Each structure stands twice: as structure tokens, then as C-alpha cells.
Amino acid sequence: MSDSAEKVKKIVVEHLGVEADKVTEEASFIDDLGADSLDIVELVMAFEEEFGVEIPDDAAEKIATVKDAIDYIEANKG
């Protein structure tokens, strides 16, 4: 697992208060991890801060799973 993937999973655990073993790459933030729209906004902000990437609203709307977040970050980080 990449360093980015580990950091994404850590952020998800901290922000959503879920067990680490539930945070799989296939896990949907809303359907599997119980996030609501405010949680998603907070996660996006945390990802932006941690990785130094900007995630525009149209891109954030397409990030539905943990893998989506990892893929976006790895494709766009400096």
C-alpha cells in the first residue's frame, strides 16, 4: 500500500470515527462508512491540507470511495 493510501485511510478513520479495518479501498464514504455531506467536505479539506492538492468541487463530487480519493491525490499531488 502506498504512503498516500495509508495517509488517506488514517484521515478517514480520524474524521469519521470508524474502525480502521472498515476503511478498505472499495468502501464508499456514504454507503459503507456513514459519512454525510458535511463529513465529505471535511474529508476533502483534510486531504487538501495533508497532500497540498486542490480538489475542486466537480472533482470532489466524483470521489465516492476511498480508492477514488487515493487515485485523485496520487494523480494530482506535487
Swiss-Prot record:
PTM text: 4'-phosphopantetheine is transferred from CoA to a specific serine of apo-ACP by AcpS. This modification is essential for activity because fatty acids are bound in thioester linkage to the sulfhydryl of the prosthetic group.
Keyword field contains Disulfide bond: no
Protein family (similarity comment): Belongs to the acyl carrier protein (ACP) family.
Gene Ontology biological process terms in this record: lipid A biosynthetic process
Domain of life assignment: Bacteria
Localization (cell): Cytoplasm
Pathway listed: Lipid metabolism; fatty acid biosynthesis
Domain Carrier: 2-77
Protein's name in the database: Acyl carrier protein
Residues modified as O-(pantetheine 4'-phosphoryl)serine: 37
Task of the protein: Carrier of the growing fatty acid chain in fatty acid biosynthesis.
Organism, scientific name: Sphingopyxis alaskensis (strain DSM 13593 / LMG 18877 / RB2256) (Sphingomonas alaskensis)
Matching InterPro entries: ACP, ACP-like_sf, PP-bd_ACP, Ppantetheine_attach_site
Key words of the record: Cytoplasm, Fatty acid biosynthesis, Fatty acid metabolism, Lipid biosynthesis, Lipid metabolism, Phosphopantetheine, Phosphoprotein
Pfam families: PP-binding (PF00550)
Family annotation (NCBIfam families): acyl_carrier, PRK00982.1-2, PRK00982.1-3, PRK00982.1-4, PRK00982.1-5
GO molecular function terms attached to this record: acyl binding; acyl carrier activity
Gene3D superfamilies in the cross-refs: ACP-like (1.10.1200.10)
SUPFAM superfamilies: ACP-like (SSF47336)
Disulfide bond sites: none
GO CC list: cytosol; membrane
